[in-house]
Amino acid sequence: MIDINLIRDPKTREKVVESEKKRFRDGLAVGKAYELDRKRIEMNFRLDQINTRINQLNREIKSGYRQGKNKEDGDLSEKVAEIKGLSDEAKGLRDDVKAVEDELNKVMKGIGNIISPSVVVSNDEKDNPIVRSYRSSRNMQKNPRPFCVLMKDFTHSVAGAKVMGHRGYYLSGKMARLAQALTRYAIDFLENKGYTYIQTPVMLRRDVMRKTSQLSDFDDQLYKVEDDLYLIATSEQSLAALYMDERMVPQEVPKKFCGQSLCFRKEAGAHGKDNAGLFRVHQFEKIEQFVICGPEESQKYHEEMIKACEEFYQSLDISYNVVGIVSGELNDAAAIKYDLEAYFPSAEKYRELVSCSNCTDYQSRELEIRYGVVKENNRKIYVHLLNGTMCAVQRALCCIVENYQTGDGIAIPDVLQGYFGGDLIELGP
């Protein structure tokens, strides 16, 4: 969530409202958060007054005892009665403070990160600006077939639906080997850039998941395993929590991770979209870039991360556009986000393979991942967290299959042939 101090200061509070309006919200949550925070401060001030008075009364009672008085004496009995009344008031106040804090936390989680000035203000993804492009020089197959047709003998979607339900699948044979080759190549690619390979938990406790996900994701995206456990939708969630409740000094950052995990998504908002094939499924594998850095370096690493993605897809010789995501399409945690959209020749469309976000200190504040050893202006400083898909394996596989189809089958990209152990997947008629 954002820094509550931004809401307390009238000047910065207006900036938060402006940022919310860029997300095409009314900004009323900012005013509500301000009122709840002020109410909390007032109640805590009253609690401090009560505690101070109780401590004073206890000292006076002890002094009276030392003078030989007992609690039935008039002045002491009045003091004892006052302590009881104050204690009852304090108990009620503490309950009220807890209720206000819970409501404040809920409201604050609904306020998005401060949007970067460079983000285009729009609520229509058609306005996403193209930042950079790459075009393959390979000769494409005429009348290309869609990936779902090309892969049908390897995905066993009917059997998958029987055992798992909608969007279930098995992946077999050389297509599964190609997926494995793509995974190994993506890991090696990032390790060669100084990233530390890490396999993450695929389940997180509810209290941890709440700190790494939007509230709307709990219903729309996340699978619940037990009352207190959820399956991750991306390894970003488990990587973000790796240093939860810790302090990192400048010498420890940046930390750059290549995360590998299975991912699970309900895709509740995608009913009717991409029903065929592996492009949009409930269970998939993903190789993720994740960077932890100091506040002054996150913009630099954000650019480095998207350029690493570009190098990866250039090495696969896949045509793509990098687009900047408009303000109204940003998730709450992101201050700025790039998508890499790759070309699918059968539809003659560019479709998202990569999302790369700078979340600044939005997630680290809730996770209490602090930065440095001193407070700035008596305020805590937090690390910045960045995430970016390197390879969503099933989606990237669909893209490669379409782009590398030939009259004989599926040609294997040069950089994958050593991992795959060949240069062609033969297809039946």
UniProtKB/Swiss-Prot annotation:
EC number per UniProt: 6.1.1.11
InterPro entries xref list: aa-tRNA-synt_IIb, aa-tRNA-synth_II, aa-tRNA-synth_II/BPL/LPL, Ser-tRNA-ligase_type_1, Ser-tRNA-synth_1_N, SerRS_1_N_sf, SerRS_core, tRNA-bd_arm
Top-level class of the enzyme under EC nomenclature: ligase
Recorded superkingdom: Eukaryota
An annotated GO BP: seryl-tRNA aminoacylation
Residues that, per the record, bind ATP: 265-267, 281, 352-355
Keywords: Aminoacyl-tRNA synthetase, ATP-binding, Ligase, Nucleotide-binding, Protein biosynthesis
Catalytic activity: tRNA(Ser) + L-serine + ATP = L-seryl-tRNA(Ser) + AMP + diphosphate + H(+); tRNA(Sec) + L-serine + ATP = L-seryl-tRNA(Sec) + AMP + diphosphate + H(+)
Keyword Glycoprotein tagged: no
Pathway(s) of this molecule: Aminoacyl-tRNA biosynthesis; selenocysteinyl-tRNA(Sec) biosynthesis; L-seryl-tRNA(Sec) from L-serine and tRNA(Sec): step 1/1
Binding annotation for L-serine: 234-236, 288, 389
Signal peptide bounds: none
Any one Pfam family match given in the protein's UniProt record, by short name: Seryl_tRNA_N
UniProt GO molecular function: ATP binding; serine-tRNA ligase activity
Keyword Cytoplasm: no
Function: Catalyzes the attachment of serine to tRNA(Ser). Is also probably able to aminoacylate tRNA(Sec) with serine, to form the misacylated tRNA L-seryl-tRNA(Sec), which will be further converted into selenocysteinyl-tRNA(Sec).
Subunit architecture: Homodimer. The tRNA molecule probably binds across the dimer.
Domain remarks: Consists of two distinct domains, a catalytic core and a N-terminal extension that is involved in tRNA binding.
Family: Belongs to the class-II aminoacyl-tRNA synthetase family. Type-1 seryl-tRNA synthetase subfamily.
Name of the protein in its database record: Serine--tRNA ligase
Originating species: Encephalitozoon cuniculi (strain GB-M1) (Microsporidian parasite)
